[in-house]
Amino acid sequence: MSASATNGTHYEQLHQGRTKMYKSKVDVVLGAQWGDEGKGKVVDMLASDVDIVCRCQGGNNAGHTVVANGTEFDFHLLPSGVVNEKCVSVIGNGVVIHLPSLFDEVLKNEAKGLQHLENRLIISDRAHLVFDFHQHVDGMQEAEKGGKSLGTTKKGIGPAYSSKATRNGIRVGELLGDFNLFSEKFKSIVATHVRLFPSINVDVEAELARYKDYADKVRPYVKDTICFLHTALRNGKTILVEGANAAMLDIDFGTYPYVTSSNCSIGGVLTGLGLPPQTIGEVIGVVKAYTTRVGDGPFPTEQLNDIGDLLQTRGFEIGVTTKRKRRCGWLDIPLLKYTSLVNGYTCICVTKLDILDTLPEIKVAVAYKKPSGEKLDHFPGTIAELGNIEVEYAVLPGWQTSTEDVRNFKELPENAQSYVRFLESELSVPVRWVGVGKGRESIINVH
């Protein structure tokens, strides 16, 4: 008898005798739409029970709002978990960091009562830096596009990731090393950008003096976060990752080119923190009870009417980072099925259900159709195709009563429960929480 017959096939052997390297898993919170779903509130809710909260990608183009003990905190680079003084917050290697903005954010939130950050914030030495000239270039590139702009935040995120991809970016660790080498690299990257964009003006010596000071300020926070996280997992520490932006803004899977410059899906968690796939535990998709989008780009369920105005007003849909009004529309099931395929949600948190309280009926997109009437079995891969689809809606009854004070799922109006169950059924993913207000106490546990 052959060895393979005795011990199984090679594939079966591959899965035998696995050793468990890690004592804990990494749970992930991801935006399931175009951002602004309420990820920060979900992270804040879960962070009270975890040891470490991480940001893995993006920069200060993200905006998360957390209400804790009646105080509203706005975060752009800091993980929302910093509100919990018992956990460590990590800014991973996949994040791009504008140091002036980071320290401004720290000061503003310290003024609101945030304390002892120096003991519980860790920044990756491999994270890339965003410089002021990146921001200037971002604004210039948007202006050059005229009416075809992408609607970026002009925070320099795209140009910084571009520097990273072309291998002339500068990482935090280089700022803390030999400053002469940092100075040479900085002069080189400035020269490259001035050559490409002659109108930008950079006072190199003034910037170097400024960054010499920033080196001293940031030094106490910087570590090898990859080693830190793997050690934590081996020791059974609980880790939560806060995704920035959202799946439909992902550079690969979003509505390209109307996207951000990083991977905001599950893959970005792994590359942005240096984690292998087997460390991932729960993947929580955060879904707003309707759909919003900031900036330009296709939006199949957008409502340019009284419904859109009502959602914008009741939901106070204004961007935390951009201060722009968000575009509003109905919940989009085909979009959510697509992002669930990409991210593999194990459960969902529905937020802002209370914003729908006044509506007599609520529409939900259930299918996309070609102009011929044929239903699409996939999410369109180009904006041209997405802009040419027709949307098929299901019409569900509203509940026309306030849900803001409800704290038990079974006490929600029957039609509100049905709305949540409809979403759950369509996606075949359990809804674990429902949000009906701003504070952490307004999140209802469904199961």
UniProtKB/Swiss-Prot annotation:
What Gene3D superfamilies does its record include? Adenylosuccinate Synthetase, subunit A, domain 1 (3.40.440.10), Adenylosuccinate Synthetase, subunit A, domain 2 (1.10.300.10), Adenylosuccinate Synthetase, subunit A, domain 3 (3.90.170.10)
Residues bound to Mg(2+) are: D36, G63
- From the Swiss-Prot or TrEMBL record, what is one GO molecular function term? magnesium ion binding
What is annotated as the active site? D36 (proton acceptor), H64 (proton donor)
Which is an annotated Pfam family here?
Answer: Adenylsucc_synt
Q: Which domain of life is it from?
A: Eukaryota
Q: Where does IMP bind?
A: D36, E37, G38, K39, N61, A62, G63, H64, T153, R167, N245, T260, R324
Q: Which residues form a coiled coil?
A: none
Q: Which residues hold substrate? A: V320, T321, T322, K323, R324, K325, R326
Q: Where in the cell is it found?
A: Cytoplasm
The free-text function statement in the UniProt record for this protein reads: Plays an important role in the de novo pathway and in the salvage pathway of purine nucleotide biosynthesis. Catalyzes the first committed step in the biosynthesis of AMP from IMP.
Question: What's the name of the protein?
Answer: Adenylosuccinate synthetase
